[in-house]
Amino acid sequence: MMKRLLSMAAIAVAVAASGTELKDLKLKAKTDKANPIDYKVGETIRFDFFLDGVTELPAEAKEPLYVIWKREGDDGITVVGTNGISLAKGCSMETSLSVPGIIRVDAQLVGNDYKIFDSVQRTRNDKGIGVRGGAGAETEKMKLSTKEPEDFDAFWAEAKAKLAAIPVKAKRIEATPDRLKGKMKVYAVEIDCFGPRPATGWLFIPENAKEKSLSACAQFDGYNGNEFKVPQVPEWIPTNRITLCLNAHGYEMVGHDEQYYKDYGDKVNGVAPGAPKRMMYALEPSDYDNPRETYFYYMAMRVMRAYDYLKTLPEWDGKNLEASGGSQGGLQTMWAAGLVDGLTAARPEVTWGCDLGNSLREGGPLISNTWGIPHADGAFYFDAALHAKRVPATCKVEITRLGLGDLACPPRGVLLSYYNMKCPVSAKLVQGSTHGYVPPAPNQTFTISNY
């Protein structure tokens, strides 16, 4: 015990002397080409690994150090390897793809005992000093796996007609927090909608805004699983536009305690007595037996109704109508881009629900499966890559982040949504970015666009 205490004390002294902590040490990666998807089938793809974040190594990570890496690809090939690395000199691995598609590389820094530095919590789900990145070859030739329903457009035309039959009526309750008084008016809004729940959310309107003076944007939330809590007014919202932060579920925003939201979540997720059992909402194949009754159907109705309401606001300039959101919010953003008349700009981030029919999930490599949403014919009506085909030329789309290491919303599907768009579109490729993590600069990024 005394030896262990002395060892810990020695490390503490070393850290204090150097000013370097283990959590500051980063393993990063980049490809030899600036554009990491600018490779040909069969061409050598080189990944360069390097250490960053410190000027000298912390006491817990003295050389010799190694990188243990695993390469997976849409070609079904998995390769593992180990390379030595130092702070002064990185290391590299080379690979290639035999088919148009994506390569993913997972790498971990280890010491001379070949154990990861598991005291470092890199993200909520990842321990160690590691990096997950990717590259692509002839990705423009990848084929969408989702089989487009023959009645896709008729399905959504019918949905719009159902929604149009419900008058656009709303009630607002002012909920402006002290920090925004004098700058913005904030309202808890509830808008009549087709389906079991209204469209609800936080509406922000700049103080003293004049008629027809402002653009309007709907912002959409990510997937919250079983975390249903009392809604809070967002901390930061642009003060030069109208913003509706739409709640994904349509529950009431004010006037309830934690139990109301817990009960709602229990019902949605199959925990409440009598509720259909499921892991979490929208993730069971049986949810899509009737696509007109699935959770996403009513969520999409609320997305469209949000814009019906925004268009009625006297402060809206009548021209600029936008959408933004990440993950599930990115999926909703793409629904809006494909379904809402008059949308002028869409900014999805790490878009969920692209290429839901991915054939690679059946006995093949799993690197390109979108997380959660089942491979079910009824789910294909909600595929973001199919809605991407319907975005009009009058709407400009900016995919603000495409994580090359994203497992939940993998780059293959998001790229397929990009290639399906005929409108002006760009996408920022971020090396080492997983679903909820972006490496600090310097880091490899590259923006692709069709304009």
Question: What positions do the PLM features span?
Answer:
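Hydrophobic h-region of N-terminal signal peptides that target proteins for export
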Residues: 9-18
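Short beta-strand element of the alpha/beta-hydrolase
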Residues: 201-205, 212-223
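Cap/lid segment of the alpha/beta-hydrolase catalytic domain
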Residues: 225-301, 358-365
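The feature captures the conserved acid-bearing segment of alpha/beta-hydrolase catalytic domains
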Residues: 360-420
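Hydrolase active-site cap/lid region
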Residues: 259, 326, 330-377, 429, ...
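Gly/Ser-rich "nucleophile elbow"/oxyanion-hole loop immediately N-terminal to the catalytic nucleophile
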Residues: 208, 276-327
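N-terminal targeting or regulatory segments adjacent to alpha/beta-hydrolase or S9 domains
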Residues: 20-183
